[in-house]
């Protein structure tokens, strides 16, 4: 009987802890979201970044990973514009970039599905584009991420990834990481994706996307 009472008491403690944690998540989320809106209005100026925003965001990221997808969208902005862009210390910048990569990977882990199905390919593509932008020396990681995006989504791949992927394929060849034949192979594959999307968007009269696709192909 005493054992049963002890187990029951322990269960209530756990339930209480879960409720407290959920409340903490809500509080931190509301707090950092308010600060990030203000920061957005300041055009992500690092000097206008409130330290409490980072503290509250970090608490959500570490302790409430499946609470809101916005945690990861906002995390990319915080790391890229608040830290990576302004840091002169290369060793420290690498750590910030590692965190940026982790944010993308965690988003894919906890929020793999979007409105139209799997969004993992799109998340990996965005990771690859950011790696090219902020850490061009990490081109192999960028290649892996962008290739995953193209492989997973095929004709439905974000057309914004096409240029970045082909560019990093060329970089891989120049550095002896891929055979020269990869350039022609991937050009053919990407051209098929572009042609498919031009056809689809011509039928739906989406001129803006058509112009971008034609630019990518040129």
Model feature map: region roles:
Residues 1-26, 76:
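Bacterial Sec-dependent N-terminal signal peptides
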Residues 23-218:
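Preference for long, solvent-exposed alpha-helical segments and helix-linker "stalks"
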């Amino acid at each position: 009987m005493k054992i049963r009472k002890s187990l029951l008491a322990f269960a209530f403690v756990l339930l209480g802890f879960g409720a407290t944690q959920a409340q903490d998540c809500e509080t931190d989320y509301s707090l950092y979201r308010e600060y990030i809106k203000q920061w957005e209005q300041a055009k992500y100026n690092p000097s206008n970044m409130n330290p409490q925003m980072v503290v509250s965001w970090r608490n959500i990221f570490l302790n409430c990973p499946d609470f809101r997808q916005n945690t990861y969208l906002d995390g990319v902005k915080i790391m890229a514009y608040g830290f990576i862009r302004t840091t002169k210390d290369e060793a420290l910048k690498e750590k910030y970039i590692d965190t940026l990569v982790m944010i993308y990977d965690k988003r894919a882990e906890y929020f793999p599905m979007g409105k139209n199905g799997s969004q993992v390919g799109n998340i990996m593509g965005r990771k690859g584009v950011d790696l090219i932008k902020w850490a061009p020396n990490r081109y192999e990681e960028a290649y892996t991420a962008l290739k995953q995006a193209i492989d997973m989504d095929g004709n439905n791949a974000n057309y914004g990834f096409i240029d970045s992927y082909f560019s990093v394929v060329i970089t891989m060849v120049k550095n002896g990481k891929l055979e020269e034949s990869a350039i022609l192979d991937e050009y053919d594959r990407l051209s098929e994706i572009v042609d498919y999307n031009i056809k689809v968007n011509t039928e739906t009269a989406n001129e803006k996307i058509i112009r971008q696709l034609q630019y990518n192909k040129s």
